[in-house]
């Protein structure tokens, strides 16, 4: 059953509801009091707004298991639409991963550190990222961006690599690009006046040896 709350501000004095199965987001334009007969948790407020010195959208896309040393030689042939898009930007051909393994590579993307400095090198050896190390998403949030990871697995929730994101949607197994793209469109439509820093981790190219047992999250 949803939890009833009461919302009070200078312009609103009415009951409301909390969905107990998912985080609830309320957009506030003025000082607002929330009250309820039952306990509820309040997260860190998300700053929303545009500044001319910020980009409207910074979109960080990680296509897991897409090897450039293979795709690079036939990029325009195999991925024509992607090739046309990046023809107007920069392609770094001398960019190398710190590991042929996703877990430590994600930590490097977020921190800029080698695994022997971040201590993130194996998901079966739990190490929390030092609080003295600022992540890429924390820098973005400190500079006024609304930060979100709308598709990606949740390992970074426990080791601290994803601690700078205001909103996270974790999918540990199935993460198709079409579903993540829809989430991004809905997210941008919901906050058109914000400056966004969005991380999008898709695994369409990643080989899976196990059967696809997971239901689509959109269902």
Q: Model-flagged regions — what are they?
A:
Residues 1-219:
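Catalytic domains that recognize anionic headgroups
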């Amino acid at each position: 059953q949803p939890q009833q709350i009461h919302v009070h501000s200078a312009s609103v004095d009415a009951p409301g509801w909390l969905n107990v199965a998912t985080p609830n987001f309320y957009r506030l334009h003025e000082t607002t009091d929330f009250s309820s007969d039952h306990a509820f948790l309040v997260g860190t407020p998300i700053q929303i707004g545009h500044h001319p010195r910020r980009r409207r959208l910074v979109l960080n896309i990680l296509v897991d298991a897409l090897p450039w040393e293979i795709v690079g030689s036939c990029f325009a042939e195999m991925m024509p639409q992607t090739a046309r898009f990046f023809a107007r930007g920069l392609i770094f051909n001398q960019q190398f991963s710190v590991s042929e393994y996703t877990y430590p590579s994600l930590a490097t993307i977020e921190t800029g550190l080698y695994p022997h400095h971040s201590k993130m090198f194996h998901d079966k050896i739990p190490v929390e990222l030092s609080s003295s190390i600022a992540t890429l998403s924390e820098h973005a949030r400190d500079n006024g961006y609304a930060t979100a990871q709308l598709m990606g697995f949740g390992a970074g929730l426990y080791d601290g690599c994803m601690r700078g994101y205001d909103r996270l949607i974790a999918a540990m197994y199935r993460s198709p690009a079409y579903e993540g793209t829809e989430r991004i469109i809905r997210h941008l439509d919901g906050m058109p006046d914000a400056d966004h820093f969005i991380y999008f981790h898709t695994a369409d190219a990643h080989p899976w040896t196990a059967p696809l047992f997971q239901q689509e999250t959109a269902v």
